[in-house]
Amino acid sequence: MTDQNQKANQGNGLQTTNLQAHAQRKHNLRPSSEGIKKAVSKKEGGGHNRNNQNRRFQKPAFKSEFEERIVKLKRISKTTKGGRNMRFSVLVVVGNRKGKIGYGIAKALEVPNAIKKAIKAAHNSLHTIEIHKGSIYHEVIGRSGASRVLLKPAPQGTGIIAGGAIRAIIELAGYSDIYTKNLGRNTPINMIHATMDGILKQLSPRRVAILRNKNLNEL
């Protein structure tokens, strides 16, 4: 009996030793809190550096000198055999306030697409105009259809006396002092056509001298 008890005690001791060794191995394999913190900080630091490197190669955002303004936005429909087709029509004016101005009209199924097309059309129809001390050289009347727009020069400090579609053209063109008045129909597209017609019809003293075959001093 004594030998059997001794053997049993020895077996229990071996099992206890094996369990302790197994627990120690698991404890060694388990990552420590310091190791986890180092790994996380290293990962975050590496990602931050990569982001900085990516920012170096990113191209700076291009900012256009032209300003866009939506003058008219409306929904239109076309009746066909299959039903009504709904679209959007947009009238846009673009200018750099330094003597370049243009306008465009476009249609599309969605508003963003119509705006993009109208802006592109406006950039393709840019005009270079003359500005004399923030105003125009002389009084002029622009015409388009049933619309007539009167443009008159104004002294400095007067400001822009205009409204609606006429004001969009005058402001984005770069004028600061001018009188305007609508003498006909107030359809936005016709008012813009008439305003541009009047602006482009003005003659500077140099152009008048060239047309009359005279010097500036003789005028």
Swiss-Prot record:
PANTHER family: MITOCHONDRIAL RIBOSOMAL PROTEIN S5 (PTHR48277:SF1)
Protein name: Small ribosomal subunit protein uS5
Species of origin: Mycoplasma pneumoniae (strain ATCC 29342 / M129 / Subtype 1)
Bias (Polar residues): 1-21
Family that this chain belongs to: Belongs to the universal ribosomal protein uS5 family.
Gene transcribed to yield this protein: rpsE
Domain notes: The N-terminal domain interacts with the head of the 30S subunit; the C-terminal domain interacts with the body and contacts protein S4. The interaction surface between S4 and S5 is involved in control of translational fidelity.
Intrachain disulfide bonds: none
Superkingdom to which the source organism belongs: Bacteria
Region Disordered, annotated ranges: 1-61
Domain spans labelled S5 DRBM: 66-129
NCBIfam families tied to this protein: rpsE_bact
Stated role: With S4 and S12 plays an important role in translational accuracy.
Keyword match Glycoprotein: no
Compositional bias annotation for Basic and acidic residues: 35-47
Coiled-coil residues: none
GO molecular function terms noted in the UniProt entry: rRNA binding; structural constituent of ribosome
